[in-house]
């Protein structure tokens, strides 16, 4: 407890899923948190549910729009006075064979997963440098490091995040540490996306059982990851325990990708 005292964190895509888990973990460790999300109502609801843990705020923001992100930074400075943690978590999932994936899906993935991260980094970089001893955490994916069929576009966006991550680790040093997290197969969000829901209906049983078998067959640690696993990694990277780590891309996937 208390590993993140005097941390003032902005978390994009913080209203649900991994972002919410990170917000909860940061609050539990003493940070103050501003949850930014495209769904402002859900962000406010999440903040209300987490306020028992500490000081938490909500703000509606479309990370693909510079004006929205600038307004977010202004609000963060208003409520915190400074920002020393930015977690670029907002993102979309999307899959499809390269010959079949729709143009609007391509545009959405590029805009949110890559352009949105770049805009947030651009706006918050001077704020973080001014805060000193600051941290930027960029959410990538193991698909940014390894190829999977149907994930060419998604993987391209996440590989782009890793390229930016390395460059900014040099550009923003020594005032800001810049690291990425590469999640593996997250149990809470993967069932429908990977077809396990529909497969379970055809074969009988349940999606969870299919996921467990998949983990045993494909993941060295033989288990799916959870949003809380990613949140714990974000706490580590945001804490003094990681003070000598920058430019890293932390795999949190049970050994599916090793580098």
Could you say what each language-model-derived stretch is?
Residues 40-41, 59-71, 103, 229:
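The beta1-alpha1 cofactor-binding region of Rossmann-like NAD(H)/NADP(H)-dependent oxidoreductases
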